[in-house]
Amino acid sequence: GLDLFVIHVEATDEAGHAGNVAEKVRALENWDSRILAGLIPALDSMGPWRLLMLPDHATPLTTRTHTADPVPYVLVDSAVDGPGGVFSESGVAAEPLVPGYQLVSRLLAG
């Protein structure tokens, strides 16, 4: 069977609305240390897994509001070793735009 769960983190969005770069950095660091650091070992203990991480929308510090700008994403498959990349707003600008439904298809196709 397929297990699927969603984690929604609001802290980065709120920091964007506030225009607070330090809070946005702290929210991302907390995601890494408090959620991702425990999630990966837990997933590993259950067998093969895939993980799609992305924001639901952009909230640039400069505008302090939601925009339709492309967002970065990371799709990880535990069975595939490969080069890492940069997960950033500036990094996504050089990548081709992938519609959300295609990302979900890639996630579930594993």
Language model regions located:
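Feature captures the catalytic ectodomains and active-site-proximal regions of enzymes
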Residues: 1-110
